[in-house]
Swiss-Prot record:
<feature type="repeat" description="4">
    <location>
        <begin position="77"/>
        <end position="98"/>
    </location>
</feature>
<comment type="similarity">
    <text>Belongs to the apolipoprotein A1/A4/E family.</text>
</comment>
<keyword id="KW-0850">VLDL</keyword>
<dbReference type="GO" id="GO:0005615">
    <property type="term" value="C:extracellular space"/>
</dbReference>
<dbReference type="GO" id="GO:0034363">
    <property type="term" value="C:intermediate-density lipoprotein particle"/>
</dbReference>
<dbReference type="GO" id="GO:0008203">
    <property type="term" value="P:cholesterol metabolic process"/>
</dbReference>
<dbReference type="InterPro" id="IPR050163">
    <property type="entry name" value="Apolipoprotein_A1/A4/E"/>
</dbReference>
<keyword id="KW-0345">HDL</keyword>
<dbReference type="Pfam" id="PF01442">
    <property type="entry name" value="Apolipoprotein"/>
</dbReference>
<keyword id="KW-0558">Oxidation</keyword>
<dbReference type="GO" id="GO:0042158">
    <property type="term" value="P:lipoprotein biosynthetic process"/>
</dbReference>
<feature type="repeat" description="3">
    <location>
        <begin position="55"/>
        <end position="76"/>
    </location>
</feature>
<dbReference type="GO" id="GO:0043395">
    <property type="term" value="F:heparan sulfate proteoglycan binding"/>
</dbReference>
<comment type="subunit">
    <text>Homotetramer. May interact with ABCA1; functionally associated with ABCA1 in the biogenesis of HDLs. May interact with APP/A4 amyloid-beta peptide; the interaction is extremely stable in vitro but its physiological significance is unclear. May interact with MAPT. May interact with MAP2. In the cerebrospinal fluid, interacts with secreted SORL1. Interacts with PMEL; this allows the loading of PMEL luminal fragment on ILVs to induce fibril nucleation.</text>
</comment>
<keyword id="KW-0272">Extracellular matrix</keyword>
<feature type="modified residue" description="Methionine sulfoxide">
    <location>
        <position position="74"/>
    </location>
</feature>
<dbReference type="GO" id="GO:1905907">
    <property type="term" value="P:negative regulation of amyloid fibril formation"/>
</dbReference>
Length: 107
């Protein structure tokens, strides 16, 4: 009886393993196209994201160049205005100094 049970158990295990291998093969066949489709879709999405990122980075680069130009122009104007005011003050100081020197010489 024990030998018969062992044989039946072995046969059942072998049959179950064969069914499991067949199911595995069937599942792999079914999933292979799905996996390939998923890989292709992900690849497309990554390429699109990379293109968008590249475009966004180029936009940022362009905007930064524009802002830099604007800041340089503003700084240039500020520098020119400061230079003009300083020149005006220096002229006034020179006139005052010359007047004071003239007054001192007259004394």
């Amino acid at each position: 009886l024990s030998s018969q049970v062992t044989q039946e158990l072995t046969a059942l295990m072998d049959e179950t393993m064969k069914e499991l291998k067949a199911y595995k093969s069937e599942l792999e066949e079914q999933l292979s196209p799905v996996a390939e489709e998923t890989r292709a879709r992900l690849s497309k999405e990554l390429q699109a994201a990379q293109a968008r990122l590249g475009a966004d980075m180029e936009d940022v680069r362009s905007r930064l160049a524009q802002y830099r130009s604007e800041v340089q122009a503003m700084l240039g104007q500020s520098t020119d205005e400061l230079r003009a005011r300083l020149a005006s003050h220096l002229r006034k100081l020179r006139k005052r100094l010359l007047r004071d020197v003239d007054d001192l010489q007259k004394r």
